[in-house]
Amino acid sequence: MSPAASSATRPSTLPPVRGRLTAGAPLAPLVWFKSGGAAEWLFEPADVDDLSDFLAALDPAVPVMGLGLGSNLIVRDGGVPGVVVRLGKPFARVERLDATTLRCGGGASGILVSSTARDAGIGGVEFLRSIPGTVGGFVRMNGGAYGREVKDVLVEGEVVLRSGERRVLSLAELGYTYRHSALPEGAIVVAATFRGHAEAPAVVQAEMDRIAAEREASQPLRSRTGGSTFKNPQGHKAWQLVDAAGCRGLTRGDAQVSEKHCNFLLNLGTASSADIEGLGEEVRERVKANSGVTLEWEIQRVGVNP
């Protein structure tokens, strides 16, 4: 069902909310690639109760997905059916629970988490400074960088299931593997508790600065990109395989494999999501032909083609 067609069905099919519910909401402005179609519905809940009540009353057949900063995401050009949930300011708070522990809202950015940890004298979460996303995405994906992953610091995650049920999941229950969790389809991460270690703020800041400088030197940070495109296969670096297959700088329309870091795809201007995803698939084919390794997407691809 198209967003335009679905708007007339709202009174009978979608529950009332206290937050904001928008029909046919363009998603391209909300994702880093600046491409893709619209959400059939975009829901920005007022608080956890608003989200829980909405999902509990929503027809179970309606698909639901969460959207953070949109940094590791391709939204296909036909848009996303169902409801896209975006956690705003009410979910972006970070608070210190004790000398080494933070409780972070699902909409809080990695920079906010690491900066709050620094100010509180908590080390160990500096790596979140380097991941362009929100806590909800980190927890779902077991986000990681510079030798650390969310599983190394997570105590528990607070989620609202597709049914509207609120659950607190332990580290073990999240079933983490490399860039993957056992979170069920449609579950929205609303908060997480991270535990680090006591550290002088100046030491934490120095590590954050080191990470920032390394990213600046090696990644196309000021581009329309989706971050790391492919997972690192066992025993390999994805970028090296892409480079060895002759894909550095490869283009399709306005989509390009970054020349600075070839595990990044770029939108040079007016690339469609089909251009970007198609370029990624071409890279996978070339790498398979060259090295025999099948690259697995790290970027999430959602929605439908036109």
Swiss-Prot record:
Gene3D superfamilies: 3.30.465.10, UDP-N-acetylenolpyruvoylglucosamine reductase, C-terminal domain, Uridine Diphospho-n-acetylenolpyruvylglucosamine Reductase, domain 2. Keywords: Cell cycle, Cell division, Cell shape, Cell wall biogenesis/degradation, Cytoplasm, FAD, Flavoprotein, NADP, Oxidoreductase, Peptidoglycan synthesis. Pfam families: FAD_binding_4, MurB_C. GO terms for biological process: cell division; cell wall organization; peptidoglycan biosynthetic process; regulation of cell shape. It is found in: Cytoplasm. Its cofactor is FAD. Residues 220-232 have a biased composition (Polar residues). The active site is at R179, S228, E298. Its EC number is 1.3.1.98. InterPro entries: FAD-bd_PCMH, FAD-bd_PCMH-like_sf, FAD-bd_PCMH_sub1, FAD-bd_PCMH_sub2, MurB, MurB_C, MurB_C_sf, Oxid_FAD_bind_N. Residues 215-234 are annotated as: Disordered. Pathway: Cell wall biogenesis; peptidoglycan biosynthesis. GO terms for cellular component: cytosol. One of its GO terms (molecular function) is UDP-N-acetylmuramate dehydrogenase activity. It is an enzyme of class 1 (oxidoreductase). Its main location: cytoplasm. Residues 34-199 form the FAD-binding PCMH-type domain. It catalyses: UDP-N-acetyl-alpha-D-muramate + NADP(+) = UDP-N-acetyl-3-O-(1-carboxyvinyl)-alpha-D-glucosamine + NADPH + H(+). Belongs to the MurB family. Cell wall formation. This is UDP-N-acetylenolpyruvoylglucosamine reductase. It comes from Rhizorhabdus wittichii (strain DSM 6014 / CCUG 31198 / JCM 15750 / NBRC 105917 / EY 4224 / RW1) (Sphingomonas wittichii).
